[in-house]
Amino acid sequence: LCLACDDENKAFAIGFKTPPADSTGVFHILEHSVLCGSAKFPVKEPFVDLIKSSMQTFLNAMTYPDKTIYPVATTNEQDLYNLMDVYLDAVFNPAIYTKPTIFEQEGWHYELDLPESAEGEGDGSPASLREGTLRYNGVVFNEMKGALSDPMSVLDDAVNAALYPDTAYAHESGGDPRAIPALTYEQFLDTHARHYNPSNSYITLYGDLDVDRALAFLDERYLSQPSAASRRMDAAVAAGEDPSTLAPNPLGVQAPVTCEYKRVEMATTPENALVGLGLVLGSALDRKRTIAADILFEALLGSNEAPVKKAILAAGLGGNVVSYT
């Protein structure tokens, strides 16, 4: 998609359809991991280097429940090509295929907590090692431990799982700390190979730029070239794997469901107890219905003077009421 205009801000984004099949957070871990070096840019943290050295006005990567997006923006056209080069090499030729430690660092690994000696530190002796406690660690693992310590996040996951039990939305795309350690390195690589390819991507260009030059750059440098992911896929086909198992995860379609009641217990104080009501309002493609729902819920619950919220608070049924669509 090319959105040519006279805005001096020039932007590029590549997105991949990444509906999860479980709650291991594989796509969240991939989002972190591909930005830990690539074939053309074998540095430890290219993302950090770009923040320091480029003229970027926006630089990020985001994992959603059904897609992963890598957007960049800058006011300088040549800088845009530099940013595109780094990001495209990161997503198509990441260092994850040659450096398993990236998966362990960003996803999960075992770590031994040693007991403190008399001097206050584990002495590393055989006895100390035997008494040590093995625990999980990892960037995404710890990030999601923090995210899911919020009762609102736990409630949101429970509502989605109840409303969309047969689809990708039943899973925690960011990763559930209880499920993340079930993800293996081979599954991690296979998931990248199946999803991070041009046929499963969508590219957007925006701003005052030479569209023909940009398209030629994309095609010549990456879209028409073999990638680390495509080479792994070719090897799998050559080894006799069923091609149908190599396709990206489907989003899934389900029949209407009714879930009258579901309780989720969490180690928290009674003051943090929550109750939620979820409704499936139809397809997201029905834009008029979506906008109407936004307006309706804003009118009913959008402020302390909104009628439904005001009535609930006045009745003492809760300390706060929120809604979102």
Please state what every model-predicted region is.
Residues 1-8:
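N- or domain-start disorder-to-order transition segments that initiate the globular core
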Residues 17-19, 33-250, 254-258, 263-292, ...:
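Charge-rich, well-structured scaffold segments of protease-associated domains
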Residues 15-25:
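Short pre-active-site segment immediately N-terminal to the catalytic Zn-binding motif
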Residues 8-14:
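Short, conserved catalytic-motif segment at the N-terminal edge
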Residues 8, 23, 286-287:
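Short glycine/serine/proline-enriched coil/turn segments at secondary-structure junctions
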Residues 26, 30-34:
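Active-site His/Glu-centered metal-binding helix of metallohydrolases
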